Structures are given as structure tokens and as C-alpha cells.
């Protein structure tokens, strides 16, 4: 038996290493392919379910208390940017109280963009919010949230196959979306979309940097969430 332990150990290491390679490189490619062939209706349904889960089941969000007039001015400003650049994807803008999430804006599958009251309050003007949303539009355009969610599910299924716990894969998706970190390539794509959009509409790019610096200051104070790291976005 002792003579075979080395081979067994080597086989286990090879299996683990192969699995790691598949998760790191194979799963993202599979997620990209699945996203391309998925009907938009299916992605939209996933986004609706994720938002509903975040609203109720997980209690991340509360109804927005931002004044209706302020919401409208942000929506109009973002609409003007999209009209000017003519490259915006279809999107749906949602306002929520951030609760434990705090000051943030992010994309969900199905072209949904969520803006929290806290980041609206943190901004000094609508231009800063539009700059942040231009970045999120980059994620929407490239379907990054959906691709990341598929990647998470595929990785979860692999883990479930090992542990035998399948139920956690579906039930944990909304929470997983809140902890999701885009790859550096995805962030770069979103940053470039935002930069081009701001330049085409003659909006100052520093508006994006200014609000991110305030978000970063909050993070150092422990009052901002640790997901969607502002410092990473600023880079």
C-alpha cells in the first residue's frame, strides 16, 4: 500500500490542479459562450429575480427616499448622455436605499442598474452620478453581470458536484451578486466606455475620480461596503 501512496497523492494533486485550471480559465470562456446564446428574456428574468431577492428575501435594500425630482434629474442627465454618444445599451434605472450596501451603484443581469440613496447623497452634483452610471453602462453593454453570474453558477455547480449540496447554488445567487468582483479586463472595458462617453459629451472625467475618492475615504473609515472597491475602479 505504501508503494501506491505516492501515486495516489500525485493523482489527487493533478486532479486539484486540473480543476483549478478549469475554474480559472475554462469557466470564464464557457460563461462568455453561454451568455452569447442565452435569450435576452431569460437574462431579464434572472435580473428581476435577483432584484426581488435583494429587495425582500435578503433585505439588502429598502425603498428609496431620494426625492422624485432628484431621481428625474439624474435620469434625464443620463438620457442626454446616451442620446449624445448613441452607443448606450438598453437599461433600466432603479433607486434603492442601500442599507448594509451603502453608497454604491452597480449593474444586475437583464440591463438593470441600481443606484443607492447613499451614493446620491455623497455626490456633489448629478454629473458625478452620471459619470458613475456611465461606468455601469459599460458593464451593461458587455453583459458583465450576467457573464459573472453564469461563471459563479458554473463554479458553484462544480463545488456542488463535490459536496453534494446543490440547493445553495440557486438560493445564493442574489447574495453572490453583491459580493461579485469583476475581472480587471471587465473593469477596464467599463472604464473605457465611461471615459469615451464623458469625453464625447464634454463632461469632466475628474467627476468620476472625485466621487470615487470620496467613496474610498468612506471605505477607509469603515462606512462603505468592501465590494466594488472604489480604489480599483479609480485605477
Locate each region found by the language model.
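A Zn2+-metalloprotease active-site environment signal
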Residues: 2-235
